Amino acid sequence: MKKVITRENPTVEEVKELLDIAEKHGGVVTIFARCRVYYEGRAKSELGEGDRIVIIKPDGSFLIHQNKKREPVNWQPPGSKVSMRENSIISIRRKPHERLEVELMEVYAVTVFLAEDYEELALTGSEAEMAKLIFENPNVIEEGFKPMFREKQIKHGIVDIMGLDKDGNIVVLELKRRKADLHAVSQLKRYVDSLKEEYGEKVRGILVAPSLTEGAKKLLEKEGLEFRKLEPPKNNDNKREVKQKTLDFFTPC
């Protein structure tokens, strides 16, 4: 079988056929289509008609991208189940129950890529080494801090490190290898606000960097966020993997 199978302007039946091939052989599906998107779960949302890219991976990951921004506008995590009913592709996550439906108005092209990739990402660079140091010695942040995640996708971006403090509060760390600026503070605030929407007020945000600009310091104080001074480690030995738990470990505060 070919590594890449492509159909331009496919019918609904051809789309379903390619989804079946991808499921059977572990292929990555990319769909270029005009569609509507409906989400039901912890909340409800609807995205009107527009041109989008839909990506379905063998592990159940389901991503919908617009023609802007890095992050998907809607997504489902690995382990979700994908099916097709009439002209809609549906992704179901069981726990917590979430349903994402893509109603296809017009399909421009579908590609199935039978990818083989068995490698794990080996992070390098100062911020990766800072993260490794924090996981190995959490007390550099504060006594009783317990890091749980690294590079964790949440609704509004990817959190560098997420964990719990000694009182059970969720703690978000934003790491910067150089002097942190206003943008770093705004990014941290966005992550904290996103998690507060889901888990309540007991969420802390800590900016971790060698130093701060004066503007960043003032904004941190204004937003009720914190700062920890930490220099990036000098060595580059960063081969040990850090085990992570799922976000479902946390319970709403």
From Swiss-Prot:
Subcellular compartments: Cytoplasm
InterPro entries: Endonuclease_NucS, NucS_C, NucS_N, NucS_N_sf, tRNA_endonuc-like_dom_sf
Any one cellular-component term (Gene Ontology): cytoplasm
Alphabetized Gene3D superfamilies for the sequence: 2.70.180.20, 3.40.1350.10
Transmembrane segments: none
Domain of life from the UniProt record: Archaea
UniProt keyword Cytoplasm, yes or no: yes
EC number from the UniProt entry: 3.1.-.-
Keywords, sorted A to Z: Cytoplasm, DNA-binding, Endonuclease, Hydrolase, Nuclease
A GO term, aspect molecular function: single-stranded DNA endodeoxyribonuclease activity
Predominant location category: cytoplasm
Main function: Cleaves both 3' and 5' ssDNA extremities of branched DNA structures.
UniProt family annotation: Belongs to the NucS endonuclease family.
The protein, known as: Endonuclease NucS
